[in-house]
């Protein structure tokens, strides 16, 4: 079992360039997901969704992202989500509820909770701070 674990871990080191390429593709897919309006039709992006696009298993994809970025794939996706949310909050006059729905949230309260946990203030508070 130890041998298997060492082999599994070593592949992340020996395939560093390939892994970087996968991360670049992941970032492109993530951008396309939000720019293409997919959140409204498909909901919040998932690790499985992007792993499928990369032709990798969700577990392997998650391990790869963690090794290369130091963040889990879910944290990485959520970071991008918050980044897009900040742009929407500052770049539009839409209500927080509209932004939440555009980003794929079923409930605006869930969006507000995640935003506040990540940024330290509510979306409305963030908008007020930037004005």
Task: Enumerate the language-model features and the residues they cover.
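An amphipathic alpha-helical interaction segment
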Residues: 1-31
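DNA-binding recognition helix and immediately preceding turn/loop
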Residues: 22-74, 92-101
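Helix-turn-helix DNA-binding motif, specifically the short coil turn and the N-cap/start of the second
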Residues: 57, 106-107
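Short hydrophobic/aromatic patch on the recognition helix
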Residues: 61, 110-111, 115
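Residues within the DNA-recognition helix of helix-turn-helix
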Residues: 64, 81, 114
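Terminal helix-turn-helix DNA-binding modules in bacterial transcription factors
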Residues: 68-106, 128-131
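…primarily DNA-binding HTH/wHTH and HhH modules…
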Residues: 113-131
């Amino acid at each position: 079992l130890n041998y298997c674990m060492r082999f599994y871990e070593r592949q992340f080191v020996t395939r560093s360039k390939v892994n970087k390429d996968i991360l670049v593709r992941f970032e492109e897919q993530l951008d396309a997901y939000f720019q293409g309006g997919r959140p409204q039709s498909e909901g919040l992006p998932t690790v499985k969704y992007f792993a499928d696009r990369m032709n990798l298993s969700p577990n392997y994809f998650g391990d790869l992202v963690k090794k290369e970025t130091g963040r889990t794939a879910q944290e990485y996706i959520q970071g991008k989500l918050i980044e897009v949310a900040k742009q929407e909050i500052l770049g539009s006059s839409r209500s927080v509820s509209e932004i939440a729905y555009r980003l794929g949230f079923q409930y605006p309260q869930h969006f507000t909770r995640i935003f506040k946990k990540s940024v330290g203030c509510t979306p409305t508070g963030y908008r007020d701070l930037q004005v």
